[in-house]
């Protein structure tokens, strides 16, 4: 969930949808908590539709299962794990996508954004291998928006300000 700017904006605009924000780093969760509280206070609403939790996403099936029927997963600027031996740790790796398939409802979606070219190209292949159809993709999100409303993350702004194009995709779970 990073610093929480993205999830606080998204959740506070969609009070009828419940959100789970996951991070492995306590410091990030602390920042996210403060940002969520500030955003909700600014809008004079209670943060009843969001839960922040510390968890290793590789073990996600310990807390989510088929009957949870998650509709959408957002993966924003995750670690690209560029070294070959570490690629299995990618949040978009086939091995991880297979786990998401368990609790993602049929036609559920993954929204993915990155600045990393190799991670993006590899993720396109991983999606296909894991039984996801890439329904939209762009190699320059700001020139070719594919999301109904793009909420810019801290990393997205930083990379864009450096002239790095943001790659993005929407993938849909399909029957294998």
Please tell me what each predicted stretch does:
Residues 25:
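Conserved SAM/SAH-binding beta-strand->alpha-helix loop
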Residues 92-106:
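A short glycine-rich, Lys/Arg-flanked "PGG" loop and its adjoining helix->strand segment in the class I
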Residues 1-3:
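Class I SAM-dependent methyltransferase "Motif I" SAM/SAH-binding loop
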């Amino acid at each position: 969930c990073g610093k929480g700017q993205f999830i606080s904006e998204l959740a506070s605009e969609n009070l009828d949808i419940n959100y789970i924000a996951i991070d492995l780093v306590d410091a990030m969760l602390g920042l996210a908590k403060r940002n969520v509280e500030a955003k909700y206070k600014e809008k004079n609403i209670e943060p009843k539709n969001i839960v922040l939790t510390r968890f290793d996403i590789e073990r996600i099936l310990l807390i989510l299962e088929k009957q949870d029927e998650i509709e959408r997963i957002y993966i924003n600027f995750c670690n690209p794990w560029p070294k070959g031996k570490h690629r299995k740790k990618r949040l978009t790796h086939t091995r991880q996508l297979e786990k998401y398939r368990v609790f993602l409802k049929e036609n559920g979606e993954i929204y993915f954004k990155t600045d990393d070219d190799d991670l993006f190209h590899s993720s396109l292949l991983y999606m296909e291998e894991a039984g996801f159809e890439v329904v939209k993709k762009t190699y320059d999100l700001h020139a070719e928006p594919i999301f109904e409303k793009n909420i810019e993350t801290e990393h997205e702004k930083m990379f864009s300000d450096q002239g790095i194009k943001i790659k993005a995709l929407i993938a849909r779970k399909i029957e294998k």
